């Protein structure tokens, strides 16, 4: 994982530390208050945890751009997804067998992140026709649907990667897909937690004021 210090704001490692800290707090609260607890302390911690996903999306895009070996990078992400599956499911009492306990949140977000990288590679392929790329995108959406953040994480990575070089457009796509996930939560799972998901947009504020300039990342 390679990073250079930036002229202003946070460097890559500092942003990653924020993401890891927020994720740890979020997951710890899920274990202390299982289910969709409306305890104010739990809600506050879950709001803090919303910082994690968009930072992950951003660094998947940056990692893809700067990696020296995209095949090894892809392999590392899928290994992470495999390890995270057992850790995530053990922590939350979910069956290790996919889809046995339902279709929502059946594995960690790492599964969707890894497939998001695959979509970036597919999108940049010069050999694949557009219709086949579209078919693959829909197939990846189906494959990643049961994971934490569902297929939204993979598709958000694709759109943010397509807008690389235009930070404002990247943040717009981030907010659009975050709002989509929030709407699903609001309609099908829990209204309060649907609103909580909207706090993902806090990451936009963080990036606007603290984002790293001229930072290289090889995740």
Which ranges hold each PLM region?
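Membrane-cytosol interface segments of multi-pass membrane proteins
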Residues: 1-150, 154-158, 169-175, 186, ...
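Alpha-helical transmembrane segments and their membrane-interface exit regions
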Residues: 115-118, 157-165, 202-207
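Active-site rim beta-loop-alpha module in soluble metabolic enzymes
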Residues: 180-184
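Short alpha-helical packing/oligomerization segments
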Residues: 192-198
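Conserved small/polar residues in nucleotide/adenosyl-binding loops
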Residues: 208-217
């Amino acid at each position: 994982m390679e990073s250079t210090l930036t002229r202003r704001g946070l460097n890559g490692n500092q942003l990653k530390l924020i993401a890891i800290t927020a994720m740890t707090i979020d997951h710890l609260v899920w274990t202390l208050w299982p289910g969709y607890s409306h305890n104010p302390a739990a809600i506050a911690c879950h709001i803090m945890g919303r910082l994690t996903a968009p930072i992950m999306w951003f660094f998947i895009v940056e990692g893809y751009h700067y990696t020296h070996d995209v095949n090894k990078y892809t392999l590392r992400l899928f290994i992470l997804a495999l390890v995270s599956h057992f850790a995530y499911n053990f922590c939350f009492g979910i069956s290790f067998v996919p889809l046995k306990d339902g279709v929502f949140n059946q594995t960690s977000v790492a599964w969707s992140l890894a497939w998001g990288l695959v979509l970036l590679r597919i999108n940049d392929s010069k050999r694949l026709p557009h219709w086949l790329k579209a078919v693959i995108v829909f197939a990846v959406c189906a494959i990643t649907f049961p994971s934490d953040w569902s297929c939204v994480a993979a598709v958000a990575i694709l759109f943010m990667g397509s807008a690389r070089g235009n930070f404002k457009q990247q943040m717009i796509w981030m907010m659009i897909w975050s709002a989509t996930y929030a709407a699903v939560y609001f309609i099908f799972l829990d209204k309060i937690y649907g609103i909580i998901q909207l706090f993902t947009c806090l990451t936009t504020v963080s990036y606007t004021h603290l984002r790293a300039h001229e930072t290289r990342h090889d995740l």
